[in-house]
A protein has these predicted regions:
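Conserved acetyl-CoA-binding loop of GNAT-fold acetyltransferases
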Residues: 23-30, 91
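Loop/turn position at the start of each blade in beta-propeller repeats
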Residues: 3, 36, 102-104
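Conserved short beta-strand elements that form part of the metal-binding/catalytic scaffold
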Residues: 28-70, 116-121
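N-terminal beta-strand motif that seeds the catalytic metal site of vicinal oxygen chelate
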Residues: 1-20, 122-123
Length: 123
């Protein structure tokens, strides 16, 4: 099962301090808007999101249909099919993608330790 490009979304207290710290580790701004308190940073194929005041917990994120540079892949497993496969394996979902739609959609699962996992398709 290929879930798509992986990133981690980090809850931060001070987006400016976090940006400066991760830049010291070699990350560069790839997207987002610091004025809106969110940034996407990249170091090679590694992607992290910094979010101030948006989420309660850090989130593991998978993006079906994208590579690590947010480029659309020619072929991928649709988020609704991934949802069906995970439900068939007994994974409980907090939210579900609407099975009657196509294109962008998402669902959220939570691991046994309470870590949220979002599978978020943008294409």
């Amino acid at each position: 099962m290929e879930l798509g490009a992986f990133s981690i979304s980090l809850v931060v207290k001070d987006i400016h301090a976090s940006k400066a710290f991760y830049e010291k580790l070699g990350f560069e701004v790839f997207g987002g808007d610091i004025i809106q308190n969110w940034l996407i940073l990249k170091n090679g194929d590694h992607v992290i999101g910094l979010f101030q005041g948006m989420f309660e917990k850090n989130i593991l994120t998978f993006n079906p249909g994208w590579d690590s540079s947010a480029r659309t892949l020619p072929a991928f497993t649709d988020v609704r099919e991934l949802q069906r496969q995970l439900k068939a394996r007994g994974v409980e979902l907090m939210t579900e993608a609407d099975e009657n739609t196509t294109g962008p959609a998402s669902f959220i699962a939570v691991d046994p330790d309470g870590n949220p996992i979002i599978v978020d398709q943008h294409v």
